[in-house]
């Protein structure tokens, strides 16, 4: 059996009212495949309503190491993503980082 060197984690946050995604989801979720050794985000996805938005957020997050903290990915996200879900995305990222820290403490 080949060892899997990644983790799959998720962060959640409430969506603001009036968002298209709010009609489908009550919360916004960011999921990420993380390299176990270095904490690097290899792939990320979120529950924004449009594929374009999901792809854009994924491209912004890819390559950051959660071992370095979550401040820089949040700063980059807030600088480049100007949609109504910006605060929810930042909160979901903080929750994702919290999940990572919790899992890291168990391994």
Segments predicted by a language model, with ranges:
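Active-site- and interface-proximal helix/loop "cap" or "latch" segments in soluble metabolic
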Residues: 14-15, 19-31, 36-107
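Short, compositionally biased leader-like segments
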Residues: 1-12
